[in-house]
């Protein structure tokens, strides 16, 4: 057996024996913890989950020949079961989708086989570059993405620590920051003189994408400049009923904003 073992380990025994009569020799096994038999552990292998940290594990082998004759027992040298490092079994990022400016949070599952208190160290990466390694006392489970951009790839890694030291580091699947939709910042005014309605839609895009303006619903004859958002409509002489207008702004990356309003006829004179 190794010089030091943890409760994650499984140990096994091999033996060589001679019989004066040339009979085949088998062995009876008994595993021991601090020289006391471990209940039910009488095979050639032992999962150390069956014992506790700090116990010294050994095994006693008793040779038996094919005629049932029993030889003297042999005991292995005892080996101490040392601290079993904590483990992290799953790491993820929430929410399920996010955009630049959102706050991300690491999710994880972890445990310590010895029942020790565990601290977790979180480290974040953006496009393969570390965003800094916090100390053991700084559990930076969240990440603010202000200043990040669409398409940034985010990863978080988690290292568990107990009093005996760190466990194995585990990282999440890459997490992609998504596109942000444009925002319309203007409001239309009523018809202008001589029955002419003009309105320039203004919009901004957080990702600085070029924007395309479109009329989804509009009265006959109304136009919009796709690159500037300027809306023009010469009201017909018979304009007497309300007209619905719906404008869409598209950033070319599946981000859209919409504005709806109603144009009403001017008061009769």
Write out the residue ranges for each language-model feature.
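Ser/Thr/Pro/Gly-rich low-complexity disordered regions
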Residues: 1-269
């Amino acid at each position: 057996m190794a010089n030091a073992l943890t409760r994650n380990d499984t140990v096994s025994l091999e033996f060589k024996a001679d019989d004066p009569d040339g009979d085949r020799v088998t062995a009876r096994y008994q595993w021991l913890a601090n020289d006391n038999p471990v209940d039910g552990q009488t095979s050639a292998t032992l999962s150390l989950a069956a014992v506790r940290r700090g116990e010294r594990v050994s095994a006693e082998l008793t040779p038996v020949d094919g005629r049932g004759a029993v030889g003297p027992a042999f005991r292995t040298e005892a080996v101490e079961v040392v601290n079993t490092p904590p483990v992290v079994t799953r790491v993820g990022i929430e929410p399920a989708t996010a955009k630049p400016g959102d706050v991300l949070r690491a999710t994880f599952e972890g445990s310590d086989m010895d029942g020790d208190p565990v601290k977790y160290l979180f480290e974040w990466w953006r496009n393969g570059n570390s965003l800094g390694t916090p100390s053991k006392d700084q559990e930076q489970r969240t990440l603010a993405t202000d200043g990040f951009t669409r398409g940034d790839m985010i990863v978080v890694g988690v290292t568990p620590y107990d009093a005996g030291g760190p466990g194995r580091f585990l990282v999440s699947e890459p997490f992609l920051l998504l596109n942000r939709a444009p925002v319309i910042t203007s409001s239309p005014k009523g018809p202008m003189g001589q029955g002419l309605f003009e309105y320039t839609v203004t919009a901004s895009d957080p990702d600085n994408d070029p924007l395309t303006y479109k009329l989804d619903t509009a009265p006959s004859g109304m136009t919009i400049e796709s690159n500037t958002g300027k809306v023009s409509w010469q009201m017909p002489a018979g304009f007497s009923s309300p007209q619905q207008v719906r404008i869409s702004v598209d950033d070319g990356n599946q981000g859209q904003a919409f504005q709806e309003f109603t144009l009403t006829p001017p008061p009769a004179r």
